[in-house]
From Swiss-Prot:
EC numbers on record: 3.6.1.1
Keywords from the named record: Cytoplasm, Hydrolase
Keyword Hydrolase recorded: yes
GO cellular component term, pick one: cytoplasm
Positions of transmembrane segments: none
Protein name: Inorganic pyrophosphatase
Subcellular location: Cytoplasm
Activity regulation summary: Inhibited by ATP, fructose 1,6-bisphosphate and 2-phosphoglycerate.
Lineage: Bacteria, Pseudomonadati, Pseudomonadota, Alphaproteobacteria, Hyphomicrobiales
Superkingdom in the source lineage: Bacteria
Catalytic activities: diphosphate + H2O = 2 phosphate + H(+)
Cofactor(s) needed for function: Mg(2+)
Organism: Blastochloris viridis (Rhodopseudomonas viridis)
GO MF annotations, alphabetized: inorganic diphosphate phosphatase activity
Length: 9
């Protein structure tokens, strides 16, 4: 997973 994907979750 990408940092932005985790942050958006």
């Amino acid at each position: 997973m990408r940092i932005d994907a985790i942050d958006x979750a």
